[in-house]
Regions:
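N-terminal signal-anchor module of multipass membrane proteins
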Residues: 1-4, 19
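Acyl-thioester C-C bond-transforming condensing/cleaving domain
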Residues: 5-9, 26, 39-176
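Short glycine-rich phosphate-binding loop at a beta-alpha junction
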Residues: 9-20
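A structural motif shared across PLP-dependent enzymes of the aminotransferase-like
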Residues: 23-37
Length: 176
């Protein structure tokens, strides 16, 4: 029984895919149409990919909800995925640098996002000179440790075996 095709009898079903940069990590670009690889039932169902860096899947959900509220579709299938462990970490960091202003903040910079976040922390301390730097940096380190711990609880997380100690999280690199 083709449930998707039955649902879409009046063209009231659509698919929304959230993904940042599959073109680089898995050499696959047109992800909306790629759903037909999961099930041929998706042939003929309108689909599109939504990209907004770390918010790609959230944007896909918002787009689907907007289409339902506008009464354009009755059912929206939303899929979000990333596969980022297909390359070594420095190459992956370069790929992720494309979520920033690449020519200025990503190109040729090893692991650009930790460095960008560090610069943001430095700028925050400059902007708010009364902020207790030690307490602020301690809070950021604790957030990092909590994020790693949260990933360990998700059996599907690609990073569940990664580790970040408090000591590692408090280390501030000086290279740009």
């Amino acid at each position: 029984r083709n449930f998707v095709r039955e649902l879409n009898g009046e063209n009231r079903v659509a698919c929304f895919v959230g993904n940042f940069i599959a073109e680089k990590y898995v050499d696959q670009g047109h992800l909306g149409a790629f759903l037909t690889e999961a099930d041929p039932a998706f042939y003929g169902v309108p689909s599109a990919r939504y990209e907004a860096a770390c918010a790609s899947s959230s944007v896909a959900i918002d787009a689907a909800a907007t289409k339902i509220r506008a009464d354009e579709y009755d059912v929206c299938i939303v899929v979000g995925w990333e596969l980022m462990k297909t390359v070594e970490s420095r190459v992956g960091g370069d790929y992720l640098g494309r979520a920033a202003y690449y020519d200025k903040e990503g190109r040729g910079i090893d692991l650009p996002f930790p460095k960008l976040f560090g610069k943001l922390a430095d700028e925050t301390l400059k902007k708010y000179p009364d902020l207790d730097e030690r307490r602020y940096m301690d809070a950021l380190a604790k957030i990092s440790v909590v994020n790693y711990e949260n990933a360990k609880r998700n059996p599907l997380a690609q990073t569940r075996k990664w580790f970040m100690s408090y000591e590692e999280a408090t280390h501030r690199g000086t290279e740009s």
